[in-house]
Amino acid sequence: MIALVGSTGYVGSAFRQLLESKGVAFKTLSGRQIANGSKKDFADALKDAGATFLVNCAGYTGKPNVDACELDKGNCLDGNAVLPGVIREVCGDLSIGWGHVSSGCIFGGERPGGGGWREDDAPNFSFRKPPCSFYSGTKALGEEVLGYKEAERGDGQWPAWEHESSPEGYVWRLRIPFNHLDNPRNYLTKVQSYATLLQATNSLSQLEDFVAACYECVEKQVPYGIYNVTNPGAVTTSQVVDLIKKTGVNGKEFQFFEDEADFMSKAAKTPRSNCVLDESKLRDAGVIMRPVEEALEWSLKNWRKA
């Protein structure tokens, strides 16, 4: 029996549909009630359900975007940092395994030394490494609450991100989710709706691929720890726009900001994370995701408007 926390959100709904399609028994729980309620009530709910594993899809992202988190910091902190700590403690007491949906938005820019940011790299877009958005700061703090901390590597290398003892569950990092269904949370919907776009290079996660990969971690019992769950490769905003046009989904003329400074002065209240993640750890564990360009093209060829 799987306890599914946050089953009504964008990611949680996809996870619920996956479990239903596989005929896996699950019980839905409210993240807000867990964060604001007693640990005893949460523990009793898990015991009553006979839960053997918990998936936490709950979190606070802000609507329509992370700028909203700057105006609702209490709920953002509760959803992204307090809740994971409660889950870790109660599941630990009951010897229940867990998986937590984190975010790759705790990184920004290029990784020193090249390549994508790895799971063992300390975040560089966080409260400890500002500037960052409040959202990204709380997501990095959420990983700290789950036992991860910065450690020096020496020789001038970027600091490591290590668990204080040994990982007790999965930390699945999502990055800019999208799929084939028009939705305000869908990256492809956002790209089409913005008046002007920021040119950037990013890793992305196709939503159904993401939840399938997360569940495969549980099925295959891959080692606990952090995993960057992104479709292999990276794309620029221009490449995404070109695919949108190529597939006939939207033929409008897309406008771009001159640079990030232009974007920040005209359209944003808080800094944005743009980064590439290294997904090789997941692949080496035997969990394979299709390349990001293939996933984008499939989603656009099967595009369904709301």
Located regions from the model:
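NAD(P)H-binding glycine-rich loop region in Rossmannoid oxidoreductase-like domains
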Residues: 38-81, 92
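Catalytic helix-loop patch of NAD(P)-dependent Rossmann-fold dehydrogenases
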Residues: 71-74, 78, 82, 105-172, ...
